[in-house]
Amino acid sequence: MEEFIKKNVDEEDVKSMMFNSIRGNERFVQIINTPLILSRLIEIVRYKKEIPHSEGEIIAEFLNCLLLREKEEKQDARLDIKRLTYLLRMIAFESLENKEANSGMTESEIIKYCVKAMDTYKFEYDTLYALDIMLQLGILEKRENMYVFSHQAYQDHYYAMEELAVIQS
């Protein structure tokens, strides 16, 4: 793990924060012991200069940072993080409720899930633009004309957000 950090992190302050967070903290080392979680944690530390302490927090913060960075760097007035998050929540929720795990979705299924999100939460948004952003940021991938979440952890995160909203309503 230390070799991975040395090899993939140039910024001394980020290296220092990473090393300080893992020294003597075996539980945290176990949490970040996969390349996905470790690489996402590095990106969070680069962007926010803070360390989330659970796998769920790391995934949530990474996805949030990804959207914030895209909004700030591109200065894209059409990128509405809140609405995009509602769409991702519904896509994750509906796809997991209707299918097994991270199985593929057609474009028409994704559009249907997005329309449901917009109806449920009473907003409008350009669905094809949103889908393009989700693909550009690597939240979703297109494989053989089917769309999937790039990582099961992303789908699980957005599913949990929507499930909580359903329970609380």
What are these regions (language model features)?
Residues 1-166:
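Extended hydrophobic
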